[in-house]
Amino acid sequence: ADHLPAKQIEVELKRIRNKLSSFEPACRAAGLSMRHVYGAVMKWRELFLEPDGEFNWFFKRMRLGYHVGSFMFIHAGFDDEMADLLRADGVKALNRHFRDAMFGEPFDLYYGSIANTIRTKYRSIDNRLSPKGVEKLHDSGIHAIIHGHRNLLDGQRIMLRRGLINFECDSTIDQHSRHKEGLTGSGAAVTVVHPDGYILGISTDFPYAKAFEPKRTLTALSSALTSEDKSGKPNR
């Protein structure tokens, strides 16, 4: 209750109830007993969490955010508390807080502001990002974020959220999720931020590459506004 509003608590309890009723039948349908599931979890623990595990390096090297130029690469997004942290101490402090939280109390990590950066979809139940928070991100040199987490079925897209430019680059990879979403074939995507000043989005879920060229967009917009001023009518 110290971490979550009542509305969020009810949402989480509903999710738990749904999982309790559906998990074991889903495992049986996949031919898995609870012993199989337990064995898989223990193997994952051995590979990823044990000091000599094959993939132990993954969590040691993991960074929550990567700031380059005016872009911030992040899993989902930001709230006001993280905007405060970034303006005050920068992305190194963000990553340091994340690493510390990973080895602390799991509940604090998952439901606190740090984990909001990997959970938020800017819903009413998510931590708030206000216009002042966006202003602080701008003060930190962040004018656009490149992220995943939002479920997209037709490739990358650009959105303006809370006054912050979002390049949404999620791709559904695993076959089970693709089947549930009605997607065919294998899932793959790449977003190219090119040094020449354009962004290219390529996805198996869209038949063409998507290109964002700021200079070209600005030229077209300026031309449209000039045409509108001369005619006195909106140029649609």
Question: Where are the language model's segments positioned?
Answer:
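Feature recognizes metal-dependent phosphohydrolase scaffolds
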Residues: 1-236
